[in-house]
Design a protein with these regions (language model features):
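N-terminal export signals
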Residues: 1-2, 6-29
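Flexible C-terminal active-site loop/helix
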Residues: 10, 35-49, 64, 337-407
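Structured beta-strand/loop patches that form or line metal/cofactor-binding pockets in enzymes
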Residues: 31-92, 364, 368
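Metal- or metallocofactor-binding catalytic centers and their adjacent structured scaffolds
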Residues: 34, 39-43, 75-157
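Conserved, mostly hydrophobic/aromatic
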Residues: 79, 146, 159, 231, ...
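Active-site mouth loops of central-metabolism enzymes
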Residues: 173-185, 206, 281
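Alpha/beta enzyme core
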Residues: 189-198, 244-251
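Catalytic core of soluble alpha/beta enzymes
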Residues: 203-342, 371
Length: 407
């Protein structure tokens, strides 16, 4: 049975490559215009958090403290502009804002010069040859920003939204899941009541079983109508995890439990899966489609958490989704408190997939400014754009006003 699953996964991976190549070939009409990228600008930007955001590995955002993003502006010789962006969360993954800027300016952006916007397969190949993947993938956050700019350009030059470059959307709107930062039980209960339009929350837990159970009780009493997606962000040790898992059946509104153990400990995740009353999801331990395939062979999890930055871009993230589905793994969508450009890239991608829960894209929840114009959102529901490219505009003057000074 496992052999068949592996073969099917490999076949689907090959199909994913073929589909992507086919789109590049089909873009010849716009390509014949001769529009080639002549300039790539890298812009580090700070955007303040409204409130603190604490997860299992520590604080990833503080009130009034700028979160650090990197925007990419790619301009063609006929004046078309494509935007890309990525977040940086070095206590979640290793790419600092300085590393992303340096990688883009010195290694990746030069690879884009002289290319058309439709050569993203060539771009990905050259990026992986320049910054070689090690075990999983290499410098994925930086690569993601540049690929999004290519896709935005390709969409604008063909008059198509990004979701159509991926085969078209399955959903016209996307309901969002918001996050509940680790805090005292009463404060976490107040947070879920603060967003009445949101019906699904990713509840962050700390690795302290007794405190986490008290938090869950408080949240469940405050909003018995919600669905809970648990996320430990690698914070649990084996003995505490066993106690926590044993107590979880008390809560009937939990749908899954994400990354309870360290990202490197796949066998520990498999052991936790055997004892968990709810499906287990892998996130920090699964960056690439190769990771998905290995995890499926180990039977280490039930669900895969997709993130555009950790995958190295939209098309690599889509490839991970294909491999996961081919191996019988459910799909969850998430982000890293993405600001507007990378947030919208995820919206386009997730509109083409059948996710098991609303994607956890919490930028509108935590950030004081999404740094885009034209996003349509009511309550916790985003309309998937049908305008070309990302379907939004970037307020460039505001972006430059919030430029970070590095070094």
């Amino acid at each position: 049975m496992k052999t068949d699953r592996r073969r099917f996964g490999l076949a689907m991976t090959a199909g994913g490559f073929a589909m992507s190549s086919g789109w590049a070939a089909g873009a010849s009409a716009a390509d014949s215009k001769g529009a080639r990228i002549r300039k790539v600008e890298v812009i580090p930007v700070g955007i303040e958090f409204r409130t603190a955001f604490n997860i299992g590995v520590g604080q990833v955002g503080g009130k009034g403290v700028p979160a650090k993003y990197v925007y990419v502006k790619a301009t063609t010789d006929d004046g078309h502009v494509g935007w890309g962006a990525t977040t940086t969360v070095p206590n979640w993954s290793y790419e600092t804002v300085e590393a992303v800027v340096g990688t883009l300016e010195h290694h990746l952006a030069p690879l884009a010069i002289g290319r058309t916007a439709f050569e993203w397969n060539v771009l990905k190949k050259r990026m992986d040859e320049t910054i070689r993947p090690a075990v999983s993938n290499g410098a994925p956050f930086a690569k993601s920003a540049l690929e999004i700019a290519f896709l935005d350009l390709a969409g604008k030059m063909t008059g198509q939204p990004i979701h159509r470059l991926l085969g078209g959307k399955l959903h016209d709107t996307i309901d969002l899941c918001y996050a509940v930062s680790i805090d005292e039980p009463q404060a976490m209960a107040a947070e879920v009541k603060r967003w009445p339009a949101c019906r699904c929350f990713k509840v962050k837990v700390s690795g302290d079983a007794d405190k986490d159970l008290a938090r869950l009780r408080s949240i469940s009493e405050a909003r018995p109508d919600i669905v809970i997606w648990l996320d430990a962000n690698q914070s649990y040790q084996p003995i505490a995890l066993e106690r926590f898992l044993h107590a979880l059946p008390e809560f009937k509104n939990i749908r899954c439990f994400e990354q309870p153990v360290r990202s490197e400990d796949w066998m520990g995740l498999a052991r936790a899966r055997a004892k968990s009353p709810y499906p287990l999801a892998i996130d920090e331990g699964c960056f690439s489609s190769f990771d998905v395939a290995r995890m499926a062979r180990l039977d280490a999890a039930d669900l895969v958490v997709l993130k555009v930055p950790k995958s190295g871009g939209v098309t690599n993230c889509y490839k991970s989704a294909v491999v996961a589905e081919a191996n019988g793994l459910g799909l969850l969508g998430s982000g890293l408190t993405d600001a507007g450009v990378s947030f919208m890239a995820a919206i386009h991608l997730y509109s083409t997939l059948d996710l098991l829960l609303p994607p956890e894209l919490n930028g509108p929840q935590f950030l004081t400014d999404m740094m885009i114009d034209g996003m349509e959102m009511q309550g916790a529901t985003v309309t998937v754009p049908d305008k070309p490219g990302l379907g939004i505009t970037v307020p460039e003057e505001k972006l430059r006003e919030n430029r970070l000074k590095l070094g």
